């Protein structure tokens, strides 16, 4: 097994990233890997925002994982900056290899180095395996989340 590189995602990575986003029952309903146009536009917006970090994990030239880290400056908690981890995906062949833990470790270390005081994430209620994974990494299910589609 070769060395792992975690780096900023590029347009060339989009087919692999979107394929991972679509590779589960929830993602299959909302993602469109056959049309990368909206994803290219989204990547341009992410790249233009210094608080956005879309990264990929690459081994032997192959994208095998991804996540998005968003920094959120705020007033609460004495003006704390939070980091939000989203869209954590691991290629099906790499699940159970420890890669997810390494990506989350990268996100925590990066958040700390950028001055964040807290890292948070949400996970769909149906992803009970993911919930256990995050709890093993020290995350606490402390809040109930709500969404409103616009």
What are these regions (language model features)?
Residues 9, 88-90, 123:
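Hydrophobic adenine-recognition pocket in adenosine-nucleotide-binding enzymes
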Residues 79-92, 144:
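Conserved acetyl-CoA binding element of GNAT-fold acetyltransferases
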Residues 3-5:
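Extreme N-terminal starter segment of soluble prokaryotic enzymes
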Residues 101, 113, 125-143, 148:
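Conserved active-site alpha-helix within GNAT-family acetyltransferase domains
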Residues 87-90, 96-109, 136:
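Conserved acetyl-CoA-binding loop-helix of GNAT-fold acetyltransferases
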Residues 8-12, 19-80, 86, 104-105, ...:
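Acetyl-CoA-dependent GNAT
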Residues 104, 111-123:
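Conserved GNAT acetyl-CoA-binding A-motif
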């Amino acid at each position: 097994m070769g060395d792992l590189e975690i780096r900023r995602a590029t347009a060339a990575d989009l087919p692999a990233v979107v394929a991972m986003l679509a590779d589960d029952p929830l993602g299959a309903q909302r993602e469109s890997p056959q049309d990368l146009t909206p994803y290219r536009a989204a990547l341009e917006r992410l790249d233009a925002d210094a608080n956005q970090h879309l990264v990929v994990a690459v081994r032997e030239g192959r994208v095998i994982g991804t996540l998005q880290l968003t920094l959120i400056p705020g007033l609460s908690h004495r003006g704390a900056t939070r980091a939000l981890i989203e869209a954590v995906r691991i290629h099906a062949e790499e699940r159970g290899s420890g890669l997810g833990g390494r990506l989350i470790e990268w996100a925590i270390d990066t958040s700390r180095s950028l001055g964040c005081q807290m890292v948070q994430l949400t996970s769909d209620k149906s992803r009970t395996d993911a919930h256990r994974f995050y709890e093993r990494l020290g995350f606490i299910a402390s809040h109930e989340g709500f969404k409103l589609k616009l």
